[in-house]
Amino acid sequence: DPKHPKAMTLSQLLNFTAEAGFDAIDLTGYFFASYPKAPTDAEIFAIKHEAFRLGLEISGSGVKNEVTTADQALRVEGKQRIKDWVEVCVKLGAPVLRVFADTNIPPHKWQVVSGGASRDVVEGWIADDFRECAEFAAARGIFIGVQNHGDFLTTGAEHVSLLKRVNHPNCRAIVDTGKYLTDDPYVDMALAAPDAVNWQVKETPFGKPNKPLTDMRKIVKIARDAGYNGYLPIESLPMGRKDYDTPGELRRMLKELKAAIAE
């Protein structure tokens, strides 16, 4: 986050990623100071060239968008942001743009921002918007990846239902391992994994500190069983911990994930 007083610069982030032994980096849109506007070509190419120099692939990018709201102007704004950042992905060489089917207007939930619309109606809004974006992305060789984030999409079945309704080959799943709000999130991951075009591997599948850590062997098995051959991006979050060590946590997770892949 460029606005955070302790944030790394993008250049520092790239250098940490390479030094820690990652193969790729997800250059999320809000890592750029210009966000929500697209960065200039000069900024994009400077970051792209730095990643290349460090031996890093760019596995994807992502934006925040609103698709569950009854406010049509906000939904239109979100669609345009997605399209703008699809163009950024083309220039970065990133194959996937991550988008949300969940509200980003905290503390509200989709039931509130939708004005009380039914789940079926809201799913229709989302599907129509993402289908349009997927068509735009397909013409540019980019995938739209829909990430579950614990609001409209809380289960694997809901994730799959939405993608079936979108019904476009360039709109696929991003499996967020920490945001299926069920008793056994691994079951939900397995449901969505055949549609996956990318992942977000979290520290714990339960989204809270002091919960069992993610079983990397299970993650790798689910991905392999689904025929997935892409990247497994790691995401670590503070979750309110005062002693949180971002670099240390990322290194721990990477070591465990690489060991699971090597088995």
Question: What annotation goes with each model-predicted range?
Answer:
Residues 1-21, 139, 153-263:
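Histidine-acidic metal/acid-base catalytic patches
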Residues 29-31, 65-67, 101-105, 150-152, ...:
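Active-site-proximal loop/turn and secondary-structure-junction residues that shape catalytic pockets
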Residues 89-115, 140-149:
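Active-site groove signature of glycoside hydrolases
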Residues 107-130, 136:
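Active-site cleft segment of glycoside hydrolase catalytic domains centered on the general acid/base Glu
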Residues 127-153:
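N-terminal/domain-start segments enriched in small and hydrophobic, helix-friendly residues
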